[in-house]
Amino acid sequence: VKNGVLEAVNPFTIYAQGIIPAATFLTSYPLGLRNPHEWDVFYYSLGGLDIARELYAAQGMHFVGPVHHGPNIIHSKVPIRSIDDFAGRKMRLPGGMVAEVFTQIGAETTVLPGSEIFPALEKGTIDVADYVGPAVNYALGFSQVTDYIVMGPPGFMSLYQPVDLMDITVGQAAWDALSPQMKQFVEMETHVYSDMHHAAIQKADQEAW
């Protein structure tokens, strides 16, 4: 999108941290906001959307808005009964702050695309893997190569990323070419898409459990 190859994208926001380090704080992070409505307040009432748009504009992109996904879970080939049990484990993580936290507790972290996680677990290249929620991870076969799932504190599925956020981002030139009415329509539809996507993911996760 930045280079104009695509006009728009619907990514997981955390992966923008490679070119926009502050994007780490535009999605769920360790000890950050824990519920979808808290992120809505951040974006739409406390200036978060303006911050995101300023950061993305500097890279030639327009941040339309956040899209709620769901919590991440961690799959493991070995039992993890305390934070100390991550020490020495080879662990797939998305990088950035998340990886730094687990590195501090002794894990050997690596970044892998989703398509490479199953074979890495199967071959024993990694012991532990974070990806997304139960539905997607089940579909990718993680339950076939791991025996344990690491979850968060009571009431929260995820240990560190209870609200994984996606977004709608449009190249600045493509956004500028839209009429004011179409821009408003896209912004409104992003709200609707966020609600519908989040509900669909929660349903799929419940069925996967």
Q: Where in the sequence are the language-model features?
A:
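N-terminal secretory/targeting leader peptides
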Residues: K2-W39, G47-W209
